Amino acid sequence: MADYYEILEVARGATPEEIKKAYRKKAVQYHPDKNPGDADAEKRFKEISEAYEVLSDEKKRQVYDRYGKEALQGAAGGGQGFSSMDEALRTFMGAFGMGGGGESIFDFFGGGNGAEFGGREGGRGARQGASKRVNINVSFEEAVKGVDKELVISNYANCNVCNGKGSSSSQGIKTCSECKGRGQVFEQRGFFSMTMACPKCHGEGKVITDPCKNCKGQGAVKEKQHIKVHIPAGVDSGMRLKMSGYGDVGQHGGPAGDLYVFINVEPHEIFEREGNDILLDLPISFAEAALGCKKEVPSLTNRACRITIPEGTQNGKIFRVKGEGFPNVHGHGKGDLLVRIFVETPTRLSERQKELLQEFSELEGPNNLPKRKGFLDKIKEFFSPN
């Protein structure tokens, strides 16, 4: 067998904490439950456990450091290898210590806080009430200016008959006979001894024998509540407002849950949102685009905005009106109003209009259509022989 320090991949001067951490990591990696039927993993697991058994014991480690593992022959658990998996598993369980140091075996097997095993569920400590979610629609204009909305929500509140105790009298609350008031029971599963919430009292440690008739022993009843929600200017769809303490009542003196308000901004008939900017498509005639004009455009700040459209303006041109967009919801600056030009091609022309357009077309020259001229020049260049 290789050197014990090499097996655990630690330095010879490693601290007990470093040795324990290294062992835990490797032991979980090669644990038989994670590697069923893998003989090599089983062998590695025994070697790792033997190395830890020696290096975690101060006296054995001193002997090993001075004289090697041969000097440990005959010592319990050291020097002669773990002949059975039971010995290795006992070392494994001892290393995790059932919660010593704030860690649990479930943290290493991917169980997080052990809740799926019942290790930390329940309990009699203060617990926060459940949080709630509501969706609220606001108009485009309300999102620009901000608005106050009234909501009606249903939350669990303390029963005003039993004051949240759940019992009609103090004599109606008894210590749980199953867990003797601990709120937890122990269960042995193979090599593992697990702590679970008591199934009789659900981790409370007490049972109610004389339940309150108003709340049916729950200690809380559902109540409707009218609340006012301030929607700040600049909100957008998908944003969330948190209202602390507007969820269900807490248990055992714990704080109430929170209310999360999810915003949905309704679309507008003529405006669109682009970040904090507001986009407006402005239709103008062919003549207005060619000759230029002045236009008054609407805004959501109730202020008339005038823009000057110069002659020769092309379709899709955007004019920017500063400060007429959405305010930043965090309070820093405002977006702009973007006016995008849409040049309409005339339809349903009269004979006279057609004649005039035909006459105009005959008078057009390359200088009137610079983009087309440039395009035709590129086409000629493309097809011309070298």
From Swiss-Prot:
Gene3D superfamilies: DnaJ domain, Heat shock protein DnaJ, cysteine-rich domain, Urease metallochaperone UreE, N-terminal domain
Cofactor (UniProt): Zn(2+)
Zinc finger motifs (CR-type), residue ranges: 146-224
Binding site for Zn(2+) 1: 159, 162, 212, 215
Main location: cytoplasm
CXXCXGXG motif repeats: 159-166, 176-183, 198-205, 212-219
Alphabetical list of PROSITE patterns matching this protein: DNAJ_1 (PS00636), DNAJ_2 (PS50076), ZF_CR (PS51188)
The entry's keywords: Chaperone, Cytoplasm, DNA replication, Metal-binding, Repeat, Stress response, Zinc, Zinc-finger
GO molecular function: ATP binding; heat shock protein binding; unfolded protein binding; zinc ion binding
Entry's localization field: Cytoplasm
One CC-aspect GO term: cytoplasm
Annotated residues for binding of Zn(2+) 2: 176, 179, 198, 201
Keyword Repeat assigned: yes
Biological process, per Gene Ontology: chaperone cofactor-dependent protein refolding; DNA replication; protein refolding; response to heat
Cofactor binding description: Binds 2 Zn(2+) ions per monomer.
Domain named J: residues: 3-68
Function description: Participates actively in the response to hyperosmotic and heat shock by preventing the aggregation of stress-denatured proteins and by disaggregating proteins, also in an autonomous, DnaK-independent fashion. Unfolded proteins bind initially to DnaJ; upon interaction with the DnaJ-bound protein, DnaK hydrolyzes its bound ATP, resulting in the formation of a stable complex. GrpE releases ADP from DnaK; ATP binding to DnaK triggers the release of the substrate protein, thus completing the reaction cycle.
Subunit-level organization: Homodimer.
UniProt-listed HAMAP family: DnaJ (MF_01152)
Assigned protein family: Belongs to the DnaJ family.
Comment block on domains: The J domain is necessary and sufficient to stimulate DnaK ATPase activity. Zinc center 1 plays an important role in the autonomous, DnaK-independent chaperone activity of DnaJ. Zinc center 2 is essential for interaction with DnaK and for DnaJ activity.
Protein name: Chaperone protein DnaJ
The species this protein was found in: Protochlamydia amoebophila (strain UWE25)
GN (gene name): dnaJ
